[in-house]
Amino acid sequence: IPGVTDKNYITNSYHVHVTENISAFDKLKFESQFQELSPGGAISYVEVPDMENNIPAVISVMQYIYDNIMYAELNTKSDYCQVCGYNGQIQIITDDDGKLVWECPNCGNRDQDKMNVARRTCGYIGTQFWNQGRTQEIKERVLHL
């Protein structure tokens, strides 16, 4: 099934699919109805870019969460390249062999031992690198703000 079984990963929850182009507010509104059915273990995530310079937008989303949904968090990217000192989002690219690899957009570093990357996967913030399936899922995530 195109877009479902042709991925190297699966999802198993009520969350809007990571590739869905949807606003933070619409995503939270949609997912909130399922949290009412699962109060013992329910959370929604909003993918956001670096929001350091847009605190009013963060507050707006946080207020919406407070007013409308049981439990939600913001996922942001905060990576660091130890080779050149780049502080931002390390990119996922496809190398010449078709493998997904992490690359510093500033200096091209691909040595995972010389970069710090943190992403939320399966509910936890991890700093180790992931298998190809999970890396594909991370790459396909769209931003909600």
Predicted stretch roles:
Residues 1-145:
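Long, C-terminal-biased catalytic regions of enzyme "large/alpha" subunits
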